[in-house]
């Protein structure tokens, strides 16, 4: 194709993504669009086709973004090339959403006709507006008995400020309104800007590792074109590679002769090491490089940290390789090696949130077959020492000596909770119990309220979301963003078994709750840790001060069984001998801590509040 033909082709390209709150029908709508454009045959069609991970299909959530090319013949008789970039809706995967939106010109905003706008709908709309995307509202699930499209239309106008007069009324499940959505994409989403004659600039928005072909880059070509045989260069580190194959996904990978401006596809270039590529980097040609890289993504900082250890210590290297491969297409995962006296060698990993942590743990166990122990999640604290230094601490065992600590600051989040009016009381009670500060409350319509609180992230990390869902019968929707660091009265609590600290059980707690937390955990461990041949004291300590204690009684043989009657001094001699033996044992004995003990520290919160 000459450059004139390529420019003509570019005018008929439409890049768009679908954004929605969880369960508003995003993946189903994507399925219908694939069917309507006959991208997949009816034989290959299965529900949630784009959610290719088992984990995604089981949980019914989208975790990874996917990019697919579709061909559509519009009513005006022209053929269009659509690139549908599927996005996750969950708050932990906002980063994935921002990456996919950077590769689009338009977004289809799906809102449930019965539920209306939810917290994450708003969060994703703001991301789309930040990227200057054309937003097309779609009111989905209009065939539900509880659907009220007119109320939702009004809500979209009032809450988001979008003109919803032309919003498509659709039902992805029944296939109603799909054609109207496709026509709106043709009319309203702008064609990609960019110039095919300029030097190549392609944005890497994802990458996957293939055992045979190395790292495969998923890119959006912004300027120029790339074809097999070209030598590409990464703009962040200057490394060069020879392109062996370019192509598109329809969900299956299909090779092409070239990728030109506006295209979304993949590049394979025998990139062997995972570290050579980074999501958000710009690819250019080594022979005719671009002057400057594209505006990439903002780097996401992990919010939640936890230790991951292999149960079998010889799997340590396997775990490292597995984490490197996961990091390749999950740029927000961070990890570094750490050791623990109780658990051996492992990694300290940083995650965006609890669902992210959960998903990574399941992927490690499923895809790489490694059994893991996870320690309790913690957040990044700022510790100001008496020497005037500020330390960032994410691992309780790295906390400095309490005598050297001047003050501790912890991260607070701005939590936005949308909830029906009848549950406002329950939500406020929960937020206060979690040390939240009330900020404001707005009525969205007659029945739904948007409540905003500042809450410490450490309280959200535990089980805030589960508690919120149960106290509002699942009606609340929740979104949070980091607001600021604030000074708090925090202390580090150590757990001692038989007088020895178990580093993996240490945690940070607010001074107010320290005593009851300590007491609870000690009682819980007493039930879980098996009885030994000697008595084992379990203690909770803050610095040198013991705040709670419980003893696991020793297993002992009845040494008096053979003394029928007999002299009391004979019995005493046998008991004293047993006691001396137990004492000697206790001095040299060590206590095995079962996996449940670490988990009990996690699920602590639920009982302390009953």
From Swiss-Prot:
A molecular function GO annotation: GTPase activity
User: Record's CDD domains?
Assistant: EF4_II (cd03699), EF4_III (cd16260), LepA (cd01890), lepA_C (cd03709)
- What's the EC number here? 3.6.5.n1
Q: Which residues bind GTP?
A: 23-28, 140-143
Membrane topology type: Peripheral membrane protein
Q: What's a GO cellular component annotated to this UniProt protein?
A: plasma membrane
Residues in domain tr-type G?
11-193
Task: Summarize the protein's role.
Answer: Required for accurate and efficient protein synthesis under certain stress conditions. May act as a fidelity factor of the translation reaction, by catalyzing a one-codon backward translocation of tRNAs on improperly translocated ribosomes. Back-translocation proceeds from a post-translocation (POST) complex to a pre-translocation (PRE) complex, thus giving elongation factor G a second chance to translocate the tRNAs correctly. Binds to ribosomes in a GTP-dependent manner.
Q: Which HAMAP family match?
A: LepA (MF_00071)
Concerning its family, UniProt says: Belongs to the TRAFAC class translation factor GTPase superfamily. Classic translation factor GTPase family. LepA subfamily.
Return the protein name. Answer: Elongation factor 4
């Amino acid at each position: 194709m000459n450059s004139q033909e390529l420019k003509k082709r570019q005018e008929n390209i439409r890049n768009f993504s679908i954004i929605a709150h969880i369960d508003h029908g995003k993946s189903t709508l994507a399925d219908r669009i694939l069917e309507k454009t006959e991208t997949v045959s009816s034989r290959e069609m299965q529900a949630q086709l784009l959610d290719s991970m088992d984990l995604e299909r089981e949980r019914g959530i989208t975790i990874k973004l996917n990019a697919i090319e579709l061909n559509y013949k519009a009513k005006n008789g022209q053929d269009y090339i659509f690139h549908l970039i599927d996005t996750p809706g969950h708050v932990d995967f906002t980063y994935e959403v921002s990456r996919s939106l950077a590769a689009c010109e338009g977004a289809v905003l799906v809102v449930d006709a019965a539920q209306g706008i939810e917290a994450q709908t708003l969060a994703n709309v703001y991301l789309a507006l930040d990227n200057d995307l054309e937003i097309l509202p779609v009111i989905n699930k209009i065939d539900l008995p509880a659907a009220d499209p007119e109320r939702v239309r009004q809500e979209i106008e009032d809450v988001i400020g979008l003109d919803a007069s032309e919003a498509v009324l659709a039902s992805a499940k029944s296939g109603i309104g799909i054609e109207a959505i496709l026509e709106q994409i043709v009319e309203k989403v702008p064609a990609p800007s960019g110039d095919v004659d300029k030097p190549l600039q392609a944005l890497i928005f994802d990458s996957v590792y293939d055992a045979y072909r190395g790292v495969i880059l998923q890119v959006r070509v912004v300027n120029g074109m790339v074809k097999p045989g070209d030598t590409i260069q990464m703009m962040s580190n200057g490394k060069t590679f020879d392109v062996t194959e370019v192509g598109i996904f329809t969900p299956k990978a299909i090779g092409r002769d070239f990728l030109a401006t506006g295209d979304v596809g993949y590049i394979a270039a025998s990139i062997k090491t995972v570290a050579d590529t980074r999501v958000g980097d710009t690819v250019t040609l080594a022979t005719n490089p671009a002057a400057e890289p594209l505006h990439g993504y903002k780097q996401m900082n992990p919010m939640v940290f936890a230790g991951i250890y292999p149960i079998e210590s010889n799997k340590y290297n396997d775990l490292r390789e597995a984490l490197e491969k996961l990091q390749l297409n999950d740029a927000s995962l961070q990890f570094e090696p750490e050791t623990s006296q109780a658990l051996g060698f492992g990694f300290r990993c940083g995650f965006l949130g609890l669902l992210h942590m959960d998903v990574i743990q399941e992927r490690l166990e499923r895809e790489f077959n490694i059994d893991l122990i996870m320690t309790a999640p913690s957040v990044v604290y700022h510790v100001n020492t008496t020497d005037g230094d500020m330390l960032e601490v994410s691992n309780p065992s790295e906390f400095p000596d309490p005598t050297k600590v001047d003050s501790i600051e912890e991260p607070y989040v701005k939590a936005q909770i949308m909830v029906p009016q009848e549950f406002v009381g329950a939500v406020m009670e929960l937020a206060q119990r979690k040390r939240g500060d009330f900020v404001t409350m707005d009525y969205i319509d007659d029945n739904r309220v948007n409540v905003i609180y500042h809450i410490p992230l450490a309280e959200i990390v535990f089980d805030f979301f589960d508690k919120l869902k149960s106290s509002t019968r699942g009606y609340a929707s929740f979104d949070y963003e980091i607001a600021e660091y604030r000074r708090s009265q925090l202390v580090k609590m150590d757990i001692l078994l038989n007088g020895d600290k178990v580093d993996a059980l240490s945690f940070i707690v607010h001074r107010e709750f320290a005593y009851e937390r300590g007491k609870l955990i000690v009682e819980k461990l007493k039930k879980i840790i098996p009885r030994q041949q000697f008595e084992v004291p379990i203690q909770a300590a803050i610095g040198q001060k013991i705040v709670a204690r419980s003893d696991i009684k020793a297993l002992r043989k009845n040494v008096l069984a053979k003394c029928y009657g007999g002299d009391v001094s004979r019995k005493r001699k046998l008991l004293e001998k047993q006691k001396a033996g137990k004492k000697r044992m206790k001095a040299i004995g060590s206590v095995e801590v079962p996996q449940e003990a670490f988990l009990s520290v996690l699920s602590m919160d639920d009982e302390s509040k009953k």
